[in-house]
A protein has these predicted regions:
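Negatively charged
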Residues: 1-250
Length: 250
């Protein structure tokens, strides 16, 4: 497309009003770090992998109109420098139409901005969303997760995340495999629901997969009220969870 050739030529001062697809626009561009915060993205519906492996990019794009976007899958995956230019304006994004946030911040080493106000009411897939994040530890406890079915590996090896997410509606979730998984002995995830026992209120009645959910995780909250009647795989669920000591007898 014309916009692709202009971007390839290094021309970023573009009229983007009619653009609907931003998939992989800057994927694997290791040198790109130009201000594009002024772009009109009001008609963009898909941003899959837009900055995937764009390892230098760290600009403020918080003013973007994302009201038409339906998928942000892998949008910043492996964008190791991205932190929205140090600005919390990304919290203003309208994500009300987004259904897919799979691996959105996967392996983003620097990102740690408040996104707690995002409307996630239509999101169904959060698999790997914050997996292998070294900095992210923001309050996302108010998110509407009522339609999310997949939370597998969501915080896998998220080395500093420890927030209270006990108010999440998990009634639609079927997969929590590896959700808080660490890498193993000596390398644990710190998740403990922000020190709150509210996670005991989670509706887990639809969850089938809980394999390695708290594997090598410093978790120790009461989850004795969880409904595990649908679970078929709990293999290694608490393996290397050295702190866990709760009554699960029912």
């Amino acid at each position: 497309s014309n916009i692709s050739s202009l971007i390839a030529a290094g021309n970023y001062n573009l009229a983007t009003t009619l653009v609907t697809n931003m998939n992989e626009r800057f994927a694997n561009n290791n040198s790109f770090n130009t201000d594009i915060g002024f772009w009109d993205t009001s008609n963009v519906t898909t941003m899959i992998g837009m900055f995937s492996s764009a390892s230098s990019f760290n600009q403020n794009i918080g003013a973007w109109d994302t009201s038409s976007v339906t998928t942000m899958r892998s949008m910043f995956a492996l964008a190791s420098a991205f932190n929205n230019g140090g600005s919390n304006t990304i919290n203003n994004w309208d994500t009300s139409e987004v259904t897919d946030m799979n691996a959105m911040f996967y392996h983003t080493d620097a990102f740690n901005q408040n996104i707690g106000s995002w409307n996630t009411s239509k999101v169904t897939d959060m698999e790997y969303m914050f997996s292998i994040t070294d900095a992210f530890n923001q309050n996302i406890g108010a998110w509407d997760t009522s339609n999310v079915t997949n939370m597998s590996f969501m915080f896998k090896t998220a080395s500093v995340f420890n927030q209270n997410i006990g108010a999440w509606n998990t009634s639609s979730v079927t997969n929590m495999e590896g959700m808080f998984e660490g890498t193993g002995p000596g390398n644990y995830t710190v998740f403990n629901n922000g020190g709150s026992s509210s996670i005991n209120n989670w509706d887990t009645s639809s969850v089938i997969f809980m394999r390695k959910m708290f594997y090598a995780c410093n978790f120790n909250q009461n989850i004795g009220n969880w409904n595990t009647s649908s679970a078929t795989n709990m293999t290694l669920m608490f393996n290397y969870a050295q702190n866990f000591n709760q009554d699960l007898s029912g």
